[in-house]
């Protein structure tokens, strides 16, 4: 099974410069050992089970909460039994379609 989660965590009440605090969440994700990617808006993480992935998301939110009085989180889940490597396969599929002549 593949559980693919895109999430963002935003510390509130700490001023405009939040990059250093958000880095704590990214560190938790990277230290988890699960496949992940971070872009300007979200971090995507993939695991075999809901519990495995959501435990990492929870630790990431807690890492931000340790440094901010309030935290906002946006979470999107793609739960797809029978699929592996969804994070790269979904992008690869779109890239293949882009190579087709119109």
Curated annotation (Swiss-Prot):
| One Pfam family, short name | Thiamine_BP
Its GO CC terms?
cytosol
Q: Which InterPro entries match?
A: MTH1187/YkoF-like, Thiamine_BP, UPF0045_domain
Q: Which cysteines are joined by disulfide bonds?
A: none
Signal peptide start and end residues: none
Q: Which Gene3D superfamilies match?
A: 3.30.70.930
Task: Supply the NCBIfam families for this chain.
Answer: MTH1187 family thiamine-binding protein
Q: Which family does it belong to?
A: Belongs to the UPF0045 family.
Name of this chain's protein? UPF0045 protein Mb1933
Source organism (scientific name): Mycobacterium bovis (strain ATCC BAA-935 / AF2122/97)
Q: Tell me the organism's taxonomic lineage.
A: Bacteria, Bacillati, Actinomycetota, Actinomycetes, Mycobacteriales
